[in-house]
Regions:
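Short, solvent-exposed beta-strand-to-loop segments that form ligand-recognition rims
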Residues: 796-814
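Secretory/extracellular carbohydrate-interaction modules
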Residues: 694-757
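C-terminal outer-membrane/trafficking sorting elements
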Residues: 25, 843-852, 856-927
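Residue-level detector of functionally pivotal "anchor" positions at catalytic/ligand-binding pockets or at interdomain
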Residues: 660-663, 668, 833-852, 865-867
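Short, aromatic/His-centered strand-loop micro-motif at the edge of beta-sheets
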Residues: 761-782
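C-terminal beta-rich recognition modules with glycine/proline-rich loops and embedded aromatic residues
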Residues: 278, 337-345, 350, 356-456, ...
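Short tryptophan-centered beta-strand motifs in secreted/extracellular beta-sheet-rich domains
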Residues: 667, 714-716, 779-788, 792-794
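Aromatic (Trp/Tyr) and acidic
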Residues: 28-117, 148-164, 198-216, 220, ...
Length: 927
């Protein structure tokens, strides 16, 4: 028989490919599924669900969840559009969209972590319906809901179910679905939420690829990445606000959820920009929107650093999952610190201590929880009140994955057949190491409520493998002991590796001494940290039940029974012996305020003038340092997560340091510096400050709370869109969320109404007067406000004749800021001067003439004073001596605004000449 040599060789090659397919994964861990080539090798590998089991206080949280919101979810939320028998994810006619998938995503790991047969049976019902009702083309889920996004949480649930059970239906099911998606997504592309959250889909595509090697999956990952928002660009360059009316990239559930996408995709792209996007994005977010509990705020859009801004519970669990995922891929120990800060503070701080209530929003300074929308952009009557039904429906379904995901990712396999502690808490891990040897490590600790962690190894035989322990960045003097022998070169912010032959009952002790740290918060206030825990003022809580849903589930308002308006009477530069740490016996649940095993005591003073806003929030901490004549008291601080009402951002007692003579802002940095936002989403771009978000935020304002002006001259440039109005506020205080939640004056322009507006607010809006004027949308206007005593003048473009002159003295002093109502608004070249400073210029030459800003970009303000002369001239000359501008002036002090955007860059001279031989000059630079 004649043999076709080419076919023989091809068959031989194919045989060897099939035989050695497992070897196409990267050389590394032999016990768990690694990344296949061409995906990059990762330092850590996730362990299957069930490898890690919680113990101690951490197990208690899972049990509380079982006996609380998760275990009773199908009773509480039994509508067909939720989890009832008519739910479309069970074949019914309801419309549950993301809700049932969210719930099942958390239910599956909780059920198998607890090995609870009742929960397992509930989970099986949902999993079976999806697996058994896949159509022939691979589509699954409700036929009336074709949203790609709604399937992503269910895919996570099915993946975890496979890890726990090995059900052989899962791999073909996922393969068929992803083939369908690959064939369909070009004609039915990602949109809206799916476009924001495509990273979840890509993660699951890679998970399947590592098990099957199907090459179409890599192409699908590319399609998903290319259809998603450009998250690498957004995180790298702080461009969350750059998408006009599309709110998706600034939505603060999408943001923490999408933060993992560039890193996930970097496994294929190998692009350094994708790898770096997480760290750069995190730095942007915490600088501009960071809160003490380790989250960026957003209610629901990114919203600055005010301590009254909300953090949505959905964003908390998504931030946790992102940190868990990204640390596996990057191996950056700092990410574990960030994970623990969110997990131990933001998560329990958004739940009642029996986990029978959630809070849709939680605030850093939430001193009471009352009904009312509260001025949030996405406001809900019960958005701050503990309830099984708090706020919008997403959080009550998404929160279930928080604690279970944390537990299942506490440990990971290493790429060299070892184990790594990724985050900490009482638990037990059973996993394979070395050459298929099973070991168990018991992690005995009350961490983060104590400093010591004890790891006991159980093994049936001596076995050599690396054990990696994450050393937190906040720990200055970590200690590791192996069977009593202290290890060397244990460095903060790294994984420390103990590589040795381990014997049964070997013990590793990790000591993490916890020092008090202060973090700067809004208005120069501080938050107090010890280890991964954030501490808040202990406030006696009064819970008032307003609804009863049965089985112990109620809806509450929570009120303070003790004072909360304290500032810390300490020197922040010397914290030694300032705080007294008290530790007590470890309770079953450390997040119960009365039982918490650790408290801090510190000296403080009350600040009587610090109170509630018009809408009953705690006003932001007064700009510090703050004076107080009150007696020193000793106050108690408890962990953030041990309270549902709290004060976390404390002013420091001291001598105030306000800006009250000259303030200028050219917005030259690419980030928000010193501005405190109250509603709306603001950005800085190319020398402009921009309010970008109008949907849900009819009144957006941002202030420089470091300023304190009475009589003032306020110059600024502003342009508004074709609806609403935009301008500035002054003499403002008692600021809060909401269009009119402040005391103070407002001056604005409107292209929609063709007028200039002067009004005031005191919790309600009051129009004082307006002036009819042709205002073009998206065109710059130069505006000046002069407020001297009760007289307020408003100039627009023409600085010689005011458009408005009005008398009102409702407010005498306060900060300055910007505000808009239902308008996309741009500001630039803000300059504020104390009017008395201008009018009191003396006859010393440098006091006769002041130029701000200098150097200038688009405009300057010239303060001048003719002391002896009756009249004179103001002349501007360029560097060659040519006269650029001449203006007649009269005796006295005045301010002249000069547009310089048409000037060539260079040095210019301003010369004041009086008719009595009075002359003064100064140079300025135009950039």
């Amino acid at each position: 028989m004649k043999i076709n040599v080419n076919m023989y060789i091809y068959g031989l090659i194919l045989f060897h490919i099939c035989l050695f397919a497992p070897l196409m994964a990267h050389a590394g861990n032999d016990n768990y599924v690694n990344n296949r080539m061409p995906l990059t090798k990762t330092p850590f590998i996730p362990l299957p669900l069930g490898s890690v089991n919680a113990e101690g206080w951490l197990l208690k949280q899972l049990k509380l969840q079982r006996d609380g919101l998760t275990g009773y979810a199908e009773v509480l939320y039994n509508d067909a559009n939720d989890l009832g028998p008519g739910c479309d994810w069970l074949g019914g006619a309801g419309d549950s969209w993301e809700r049932a998938p969210y719930y099942v995503k958390g239910l599956v790991p909780l059920a198998y972590l607890l090995n609870d047969q009742n929960l397992i049976a509930k989970a099986q019902k949902w999993i079976d319906w999806s697996l058994n009702n896949q159509t022939r083309n691979g589509f699954f889920g409700p036929s009336g809901n074709t949203d790609w996004w709604a399937r992503m949480p269910m895919l996570y649930a099915i993946r975890d179910y496979y890890d726990a059970t090995g059900d052989d239906r899962v791999i073909p099911f996922l393969t068929n679905y992803f083939r369908y998606q690959h064939a369909t997504i070009d004609s039915k592309p990602l949109s809206s939420w799916g476009k924001s959250r495509a990273g979840d889909n890509i993660e699951l595509v890679f998970w399947l690829y590592n098990r099957t090697g199907d090459s179409f999956l890599l192409d699908l990952a590319d399609k998903l990445k290319n259809q998603a928002f450009p998250w690498t660009y957004i995180f790298t360059h702080n461009k969350f606000m750059d998408f006009g009316a599309d709110f998706q990239p600034k939505h603060n559930v999408n943001v923490p959820q999408a933060m993992k996408m560039p890193v996930i995709y970097s496994q294929k792209s190998k692009n350094q920009a994708d790898i770096d996007a997480y760290r750069k994005g995190r730095e942007h977010l915490m600088r501009d929107h960071g809160q003490p509990q380790g989250m960026q705020c957003g209610d629901e859009m990114l919203g600055g650093r005010s301590a009254m801004r909300g953090i949505e519970l959905c964003s908390v669990v998504e931030q946790m999952q992102t940190s868990e995922t990204v640390q596996i891929i990057l191996g950056d120990a700092r990410i574990g610190d960030e994970l623990e800060q969110v997990t131990f503070n933001a998560l329990p701080g958004s739940l009642s201590k029996d986990i029978k209530c959630l809070q849709y929003y939680a605030q850093a300074n939430q001193v009471q929880s009352k009904y009312g929308g509260g001025g949030f952009g996405q406001g809900y009557h019960n958005g701050l009140t503990p309830s099984a039904f708090s706020g919008y429906g997403c959080c009550r379904f998404n929160m279930h994955s928080g604690w279970p995901y944390y537990v299942k990712t506490l440990w990971a396999a290493t790429d060299d057949n070892g184990l790594a502690a990724m985050a900490y808490g009482p638990c037990k891990v059973t996993a394979k190491v070395a050459d298929d040897v099973e070991v168990t490590i018991v992690e005995d600790t009350h961490y983060p409520f104590e400093e010591e962690l004890r790891f006991t190894i159980t093994t049936s035989q001596p076995v050599n493998f690396p054990l990696k322990l994450r050393i937190p960045s906040w720990c200055k003097n970590p200690v590791i002991k192996v069977n009593g022998a202290e290890q060397i070169e244990v460095n903060p912010g790294e994984f420390y590796t103990v590589n040795r032959t381990w014997n049964n009952n070997d013990v590793v002790v990790l000591e993490l001494p916890m020092e008090i740290r202060l973090n700067e918060e809004v208005n120069n206030s501080v938050s107090v940290h010890r280890g991964p825990l954030v501490f808040s003022l202990k406030i006696q809580e009064r819970w008032v039940a307003n609804a009863d849903y049965g089985n112990g589930f109620k809806e509450y308002e929570v009120f303070p029974e003790t004072d909360w308006n304290y500032g810390l009477a300490i020197d922040p530069a010397d914290l030694k012996n300032v705080f007294t740490v008290t530790q007590s016996a470890m309770p079953e649940n450390p997040f119960v305020q009365s039982d918490t095993p650790i408290t801090l005591k510190v000296k403080a003073k009350k600040i009587p003038e610090w109170g509630y806003s018009h809408n009953n929030f705690a006003c932001d901490p007064p700009f510090g340092p703050v004076e107080s004549s009150q007696n020193i008291e000793e106050i108690t601080l408890v962990p953030f997560g041990a309270e549902n009402i709290r004060l976390t951002c404390f002013p420091l007692i001291g001598t105030p340091k306000y800006t009250g003579t000259i303030f200028q802002e050219n917005f030259e940095n690419d980030h928000i510096d010193g501005w405190v936002e109250y509603n709306g989403s603001f950005m800085v771009n190319d020398g402009e400050y921009i309010a970008t978000n109008t949907e849900g935020y009819l009144g957006s304002k941002s202030v420089q709370s470091s300023t304190l002006f009475s009589d003032l001259i306020y110059d600024f440039k502003v342009k508004v869109g074709d609806r609403g109005d935009g301008g500035v506020i002054f003499r403002a205080d008692r600021l809060s969320l909401g269009a009119d939640e402040y005391n103070g004056y407002y001056v604005g322009i409107s292209a929609a109404d063709q007028n200039v507006i002067l009004g005031k607010a005191d919790g309600n809006w009051r129009l004082l007067t307006s002036f009819r004027m042709a205002i073009q949308a998206d065109e710059w206007y130069q505006v000046r406000v002069e407020a001297i005593g009760a007289r307020i003048k408003v100039y627009v473009n023409d600085m010689d004749a005011p458009k408005i002159t009005y008398t009102d003295y409702s407010f005498s002093t306060g900060c300055i800021g910007v505000r808009c109502y239902n308008a996309i608004t741009h500001w630039s070249n803000l300059h504020v001067a104390d009017a008395s400073y201008v009018s009191n210029l003396k006859d010393v030459s440098m006091q006769k003439l002041g130029i701000y800003p200098n150097p200038a970009k688009d405009s300057i303000n010239i303060h001048y004073n003719l002391v002896y002369s009756d009249e004179g001239e103001l002349n501007i000359l360029n560097s060659t001596g040519s006269l650029i501008l001449k203006k007649k002036i009269t005796k006295g002090a005045a301010l002249f605004h000069l547009e310089t955007h048409t000037f060539s860059p260079g040095v210019y001279a301003c010369i004041i000449k009086g008719n009595k031989d009075e002359i003064v000059s100064s140079k300025f630079i135009v950039q």
